[in-house]
């Protein structure tokens, strides 16, 4: 979802408008602000944000080549999204666990 109707801090009225705009989607880009990601768990939310950022980074890098992009069809994108959502292993939980292990070793102050 894309949210262009920023009306101030996300207190009651604004948060209701934002929630309605998000609907059942996992991501919402807030115009001139940033992104909101959701998930049923913290791991899913983190995973969603991480891969959204990676996709955006890859897209910007591809654009910087000034070459024609070979973008997959909407059907293939939907199929891939469904396959990832139905993957039999909880990769989001595993990924967050591994990130925390790295942080525990390299940046232990993150817990404070």
Task: Go through the PLM ranges and name each one.
Residues 15, 19, 46-49:
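A general structural signal for well-ordered alpha-helical packing
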């Amino acid at each position: 979802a894309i949210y262009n109707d920023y009306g101030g801090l996300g207190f009651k009225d604004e948060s209701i408008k934002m929630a309605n705009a998000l609907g059942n989607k996992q991501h919402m880009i807030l115009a001139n602000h940033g992104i909101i990601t959701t998930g049923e768990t913290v791991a899913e939310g983190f995973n969603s944000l991480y891969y959204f950022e990676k996709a955006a980074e890859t897209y910007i890098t591809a654009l910087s080549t000034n070459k024609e992009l070979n973008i997959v069809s909407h059907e293939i994108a939907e199929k891939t999204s469904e396959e990832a959502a139905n993957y039999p292993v909880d990769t989001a939980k595993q990924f967050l666990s591994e990130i925390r292990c790295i942080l525990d070793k390299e940046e232990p102050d993150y817990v404070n």
